[in-house]
Amino acid sequence: GGPAAYSTYTNTADFGAVGATLESTSKGLGGLNTITQFSKAVDSPTSSVRISNSRVSNDYGSLGYGALPAPAGLAYGAAGASYGASLHGAGAYGVVRAAPAIAAAPALAYGARAIAAPAIAAPALAYGARAIAAPALAYGRGLAYGGAYGAALAAPALAYGARAYAAPALALGARAYAAPAIAAAPALAYGARAYAAPAI
């Protein structure tokens, strides 16, 4: 409330004295963080008086210090790197940031980042072997030896690890050996190395 800045200047009422009074107030956004200065100088035939006062209020700072009671259902987590597997193959690196699930009032933090959003773990970008459902395309090593590009003609393969193999694979370039697929059934691979045998 009020104006952002104002100043007053007043002369003394006594004709025998010479003096002045100055008051200045500057306010921040929303009337917070005020700077108030007051000075008074009076010179009379018998005395000389100088008074100066300066006040600064940092209203935002009081919100970030001290222990605040946490409302029920409020969860905090530290930001960190997570390593996990994804639909696309090898480990997925990402950053998971946990934030309050329920915010009762605005919170301001100094030093660490605060994100006011529910913490939801989403699939992270992964680098490694690709596995796409029906047909599964794989890049990496074939069933036997050597790197190969291949198109799986059998069932979809879902890879949850470093390496996943779907049979059969059509090799383009390097040597790759694959057993023929007889029936179409989904091959699920979980782990560092998993091999999908032909489904009969």
UniProtKB/Swiss-Prot annotation:
Matching InterPro entries: Cuticle_C1
Keywords: Cuticle, Repeat
GO MF term set: structural constituent of cuticle
PANTHER family: AGAP000382-PA, LARVAL/PUPAL CUTICLE PROTEIN H1C-LIKE PROTEIN-RELATED
Superkingdom, taxonomy of origin: Eukaryota
Entry comment, domain topic: The tetrapeptide (A-A-P-[AV]) repeats found throughout the protein are also present in many proteins constituting the protective envelope of other species.
Protein's UniProt name: Cuticle protein 21.3
Organism for this UniProt entry: Locusta migratoria
